[in-house]
């Protein structure tokens, strides 16, 4: 509420304890925030499969969007395994090992959009030229 009162136009709400876990969004935290603010809230942290996206949009209609990362990373890495030259970016040993996170079901933006549209969830659609 303070952020809104100080002039924030949008809140990106991250459940840090759920980041990278694939356990789903923190619905209780999200509800507590969306009930007290009138500005858009984008939620982040916990998405591990497509169903998590549908659940959060269907259960908490006050959110304006989601931010996702892990469910996109592993699909990307499978396609683009050449990590040479990125050693300075951090620990890439896990990515090179080809291990997967058991709670995270990899996907891509096309699949996400098709899934959301199939569930009648508003989604900005970008058409290829």
Language-model region placement:
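Alpha/beta catalytic cores of nucleotide-metabolism and tRNA/nucleoside-modifying enzymes
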Residues: 1-43, 48-129
């Amino acid at each position: 509420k303070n952020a809104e009162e100080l002039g924030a136009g949008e809140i990106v709400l991250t459940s840090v304890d759920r980041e990278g876990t694939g356990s789903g969004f923190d619905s209780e935290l999200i509800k507590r925030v969306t009930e007290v603010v009138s500005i858009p809230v984008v939620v982040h942290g916990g998405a591990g499969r497509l169903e998590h996206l549908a659940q959060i949009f269907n259960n908490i209609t006050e959110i304006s969007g989601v931010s996702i990362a892990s469910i996109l990373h592993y699909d990307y890495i499978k396609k683009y395994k050449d990590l040479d030259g990125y050693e300075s970016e951090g620990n890439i040993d896990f990515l090179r090992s080809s291990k997967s996170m058991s709670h995270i079901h990899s996907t891509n933006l096309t699949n996400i959009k098709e899934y959301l549209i199939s569930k009648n969830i508003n989604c900005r659609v970008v058409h290829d030229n």
